[in-house]
Amino acid sequence: MAAAREQSAGGDSQVAAALAETAEVADAAGVRPVTGPGLVVTLTDAKRDAYGRFPRDASPDDLVVHQQDVEGVLNALWSAGAEAIQMQDDQRLVASSVPRCVGNTLLLHGRTYSPPYVITAIGDADAMQAALDAAPLVTLYRQYVARFGLGYTVTRGHHLEVAGYRDAVGPGRAVPLQGH
């Protein structure tokens, strides 16, 4: 009986250790939701003026948010130590996330989004704001904001929420075809 109890106690500690390791992996993989203070950055295409016009010297490319604009914001936030980032209302970014512009839309995790592009980041708001202010691509984008009317807002939040990543984590497994 004593041997059974010892074995059971050892099993309990192994289960506890496995659960702790699983929790660490889940956090690193971004599958758990995160809440906390941070920033919300919104990027929008240019709007027409009161007369329905854009600036005369603007080309169509000057008036829309591009992939490098989104990447500039994301890289600044990550470099400042963001704990978790999501785009739009439901797309948690993880190591394998690659937002891509397709025409005037953004493709992320197999879904297509139109502006405004809303980026929520959990972390030290002061550090992330400083990183945004110092990032060359964000500085260039803000010049286009001033010149062509693109949209750029940064708001602070004390209780922001970032969803957990919902898609499969990690690469799939290749299986060779029979007879080839």
Residue spans for each PLM region:
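Short, charge-rich amphipathic segments
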Residues: M1-Q14, D62-H66, P136-L150
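Extracytoplasmic/luminal low-complexity segments enriched in Pro/Gly and acidic/polar residues
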Residues: G123-H180
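Juxtamembrane "stalk/linker" segments
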Residues: M1-L43, D49-G52
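Envelope-exposed proteins and targeting segments
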Residues: A2, T35-L39, L43, G81-E83, ...
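Soluble extracytoplasmic domains of inner/organellar membrane proteins
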Residues: P60-A134
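A generic local secondary-structure boundary/capping motif
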Residues: A28-V31, L74, L107-H109, L150-G151
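Short, flexible active-site loops
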Residues: Y51-D62
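Solvent-exposed coil/turn segments that connect beta secondary-structure elements
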Residues: T44-R48, D90, I122-A125, Y165-D167
